């Protein structure tokens, strides 16, 4: 009986010894737990730092954008003041009742070129018709002749550049967005003059008498042919209207 109890106790002791964790293992497990916790803390800290850094960058970007906006606004105000001052200066050069031809010279529009090498240049014309000086001149035309300002402008331009060059100038002026509006109004005044004043009832008459081109060789001309075509449409519309 005693031997049996001794054997049972021995087996139990052996089982406990086998399944119980070793001291070194328990120590390693205890050390591992703080390591996991530390990693969580480190991750949270890093995340906070990243958020703070990102927030700082966003604030810096917003400050830069505000600075750019303020600078642009300031420059825009300065530009408007300078432009306004220049416009006022040019307007002050004109007399209230100054003739349009005289005003053309006063505003130094005659010094601005509209062509080179004997040909009207589209870029030069666009610059001329959209210039501040020309705009002030056209405003003056409205003041002194409210009934037909563009007719008066056409007459003054013809006296300076000649009728054919003015026709070419109007044609190429329609090609630019900056000068198209005034070019269309001058074109209307020009076609009206040709039809009702000069009595050119056909586009062929304009082609020969104004543009000084040979009708038999019409396809050899570029701009002249375009003016011919535009005036032909105007004549057709006018005949249908009246």
Swiss-Prot record:
Keywords: Host cell membrane, Host membrane, Membrane, Secreted, Signal, Virulence. It comes from the Eukaryota. A motif (RxLR-dEER) lies at residues 48-66. GO terms for cellular component: extracellular region; host cell plasma membrane; membrane. It is found in: Secreted; Host cell membrane. Induction: Expression is induced during host plant infection. Residues 1-24 form the signal peptide. The keyword Secreted applies. Belongs to the RxLR effector family. The RxLR-dEER motif acts to carry the protein into the host cell cytoplasm through binding to cell surface phosphatidylinositol-3-phosphate. Effector that enhances P.infestans colonization of Nicotiana benthamiana leaves. This is RxLR effector protein PexRD15. It comes from Phytophthora infestans (strain T30-4).
